[in-house]
């Protein structure tokens, strides 16, 4: 006897009348229970987005074939198991985002398997190994950007992750690296860019007397820090904050935004369309 499974059906297609009925009727025909359903129409682009969480006994190929026959031309649909996803985290030296992900993965807050942590420095090895997670050093010393990214990508591929998370990984990725993991790389950065670029952004912000600081989590594409945005947040600061105070506050925002973004991504709620995201 087959046991019940839970899967997530994600659909992007040109908007038409009756799409929800078509999709849900096919699910009913396959004797699948709809646990949750969310949809959105982008009237500017004429696109329909739908996330449907299903439970039942699946015949994937038949279900997808039936959907293809019912959906308009130019539709994209995917059906994946619900539940735990597998990630590899890339790091350099900063511990705040990594530590937060390790704690939440182990003690609640993120249903995720951290397959490995890979760093271009060895600084965070002891932290990672406390959680019995493999740490790999792939040093950039003596290597070109392309050579180092090739080694990093090969190391990541060995773990077959669903996503690659940059937890304050301070290297600019080559287009070749990004192309190996399309819409699979998630980055966190402070929201000062491009106003405060380069080193010591919090010190630059302090000198300018900023009143808010924040962070942005986004997918990585070929343009530095310009990929589709998943999550953003800010906090208010004032004249009493030193540069060090701003840095501490900024790190708190960064780790919170990254974990919240990752939660949405792992739940298969984030749709990428062009350079935007739709979160259902």
UniProtKB/Swiss-Prot annotation:
Under the heading SUPFAM superfamilies, the entry gives: ACT-like (SSF55021), Formyltransferase (SSF53328)
What reaction gets catalysed by this protein? (6R)-10-formyltetrahydrofolate + H2O = (6S)-5,6,7,8-tetrahydrofolate + formate + H(+)
Record's keyword annotation contains Hydrolase: yes
* Name of the top EC class for this enzyme: hydrolase
Q: Where is the ACT domain?
A: 8-86
Highest taxon, organism lineage: Bacteria
Active-site residues?
225
Q: Give the molecular function GO annotations.
A: formyltetrahydrofolate deformylase activity
Query: Which keywords does this Swiss-Prot/TrEMBL entry list?
Result: Hydrolase, One-carbon metabolism, Purine biosynthesis
CDD domains per UniProt: ACT_F4HF-DF, FMT_core_Formyl-FH4-Hydrolase_C
EC no. given is 3.5.1.10
Q: Which pathway does it operate in? A: Purine metabolism; IMP biosynthesis via de novo pathway; formate from 10-formyl-5,6,7,8-tetrahydrofolate: step 1/1
**UniProt record, GO biological process:** 'de novo' IMP biosynthetic process; one-carbon metabolic process
Write down the InterPro entries for this protein, in alphabetical order: ACT-like_dom_sf, ACT_dom, Formyl-FH4-Hydrolase_C, Formyl_transf_N, Formyl_transf_N_sf, PurU, PurU_ACT
> Which family is it part of?
Belongs to the PurU family.
Described purpose of this protein according to its UniProt entry: Catalyzes the hydrolysis of 10-formyltetrahydrofolate (formyl-FH4) to formate and tetrahydrofolate (FH4).
**Protein name in the entry:** Formyltetrahydrofolate deformylase
Q: Which organism is it from?
A: Escherichia coli O6:H1 (strain CFT073 / ATCC 700928 / UPEC)
Q: What is the lineage of its organism?
A: Bacteria, Pseudomonadati, Pseudomonadota, Gammaproteobacteria, Enterobacterales
């Amino acid at each position: 006897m087959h046991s019940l499974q839970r899967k997530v059906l994600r659909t992007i297609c040109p908007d038409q009348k009756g799409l929800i009925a078509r999709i849900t009727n096919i699910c009913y025909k396959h004797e699948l229970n709809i646990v949750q359903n969310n949809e959105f129409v982008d009237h500017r682009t004429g696109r329909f987005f739908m996330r449907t969480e299903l439970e039942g006994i699946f015949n994937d190929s038949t279900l997808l074939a039936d959907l293809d026959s019912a959906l308009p031309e130019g539709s994209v649909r995917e059906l994946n198991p619900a539940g735990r996803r597998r990630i590899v985290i890339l790091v350099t030296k900063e511990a705040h985002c990594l530590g937060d992900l390790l704690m939440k993965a182990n003690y609640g807050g993120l249903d995720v398997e951290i397959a490995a942590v890979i760093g271009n420095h060895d600084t965070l090895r002891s932290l990672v190994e406390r959680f019995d997670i493999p740490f790999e050093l792939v040093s950039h010393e003596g290597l070109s950007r392309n050579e180092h990214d090739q080694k990093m990508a090969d190391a990541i591929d060995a773990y077959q992750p669903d996503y690659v998370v940059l937890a304050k990984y301070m290297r600019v990725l080559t287009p070749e690296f990004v192309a190996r993991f399309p819409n699979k790389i998630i980055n966190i950065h402070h929201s000062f860019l491009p106003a405060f670029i380069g080193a010591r952004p919090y010190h630059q912000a302090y000198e300018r007397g900023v009143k808010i600081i924040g962070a942005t989590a986004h997918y990585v594409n070929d343009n530095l820090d310009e990929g589709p945005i998943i999550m953003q947040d800010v906090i208010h600061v004032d004249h009493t904050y030193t540069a060090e105070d701003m840095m501490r506050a900024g790190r708190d925002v960064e780790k919170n935004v990254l974990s919240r973004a990752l939660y949405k991504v792992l739940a298969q709620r984030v749709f990428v369309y062009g350079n935007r995201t739709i979160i259902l």
